[in-house]
Design a protein with these regions (language model features):
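Alpha/beta-hydrolase fold nucleophile elbow
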Residues: 1
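Flexible "cap/lid" subdomain of the alpha/beta-hydrolase fold that forms the substrate-access gate
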Residues: 4-217
Length: 253
């Protein structure tokens, strides 16, 4: 969404981004986030670990999910639960830097054990039958629609995002566009309080707030929501976004 706003500013009147901050296009200057170096350092830990983005950008991730022993439906259930507010282990906070000491503070869905695929990683966090029955924000009926869809299409499409994000040629093409360092249209950032996406890249939230958005309407953190903020708390999410657009309209009158 931010890249669209930068490339086609005349087609964008406002922007709302969710979960992961966007700190700008100066990719070469983001010296801290060197995914290969980060992953090498994580591999050197004992037990060895790996960064989820590099893993999900690889060829094995889709096969790992599609052929997982628990089945796609249970994979999705545990994955959604693991990254939600409902999982007690999600207590995100600021990280000082990209050192392994700091990064390994994040949950296993971000800093994975090196010998496990994503399906094995999340299988340990399958919620109870009682939880599944009471989970109003992701019913079994809705989950079955998702799982049946992915059975037909696989996860290659969604996973390709990681490959594009980390691809050096793609980064260079973006740099060659000489895009603006700022977005000047009204902007809002929304995330759940239990979402580690806010802090997984140290410093990005502050850079986004102070440098990238030139017409910033604020960071809205929604209580009792995790990574799936629009599913977990749809009414609250709608309320903050609707309020954002009302403020824009009022400023234009």
């Amino acid at each position: 969404a931010c890249f669209f706003g930068l490339i086609y500013p005349k087609l964008s009147s406002s922007i709302v981004i969710m979960s992961m901050p966007f700190s700008g296009t100066q990719l070469r200057k983001n010296k801290g986030f060197n995914i290969k170096k980060i992953n090498k350092n994580l591999n050197a830990l004992r037990p060895a670990k790996k960064h989820y983005q590099l893993y999900l950008s690889g060829k094995s991730a889709n096969n790992n999910i599609m052929n997982c022993s628990q089945g796609i439906s249970k994979f999705l259930r545990s994955y959604y639960y693991f990254k939600s507010y409902d999982f007690d282990g999600n207590k995100p906070h600021k990280l000082k830097n990209y050192s392994t000491k700091e990064l390994k503070k994040m949950p296993e869905y971000y800093i994975m054990k090196n010998n496990l695929g994503i399906s094995q990683t999340v299988s340990k966090y399958m919620p109870s039958k009682a939880y599944v029955k009471e989970c109003a924000w992701l019913t079994e009926k809705d989950l079955n629609i998702f799982s049946n869809s992915f059975k037909n299409t696989s996860f290659k499409g969604p996973l390709s995002w990681y490959g594009m994000m980390l691809d050096e040629k793609e980064k260079q093409q973006i740099l060659d566009l000489n895009l603006s360092r700022k977005i000047f249209i009204p902007a809002l950032f929304v995330a759940g309080e239990a979402d580690w996406g806010i802090f997984q890249k140290p410093g990005d939230l502050i850079k986004m707030e102070k440098e990238f958005f030139n017409n910033y309407y604020g960071t809205k953190i929604i209580k009792k929501a995790g990574h799936w903020v629009q599913q977990e708390k749809p009414k609250e999410t709608f309320k903050v976004i609707n309020s954002f657009y009302k403020k824009i309209r009022k400023s234009e009158d």
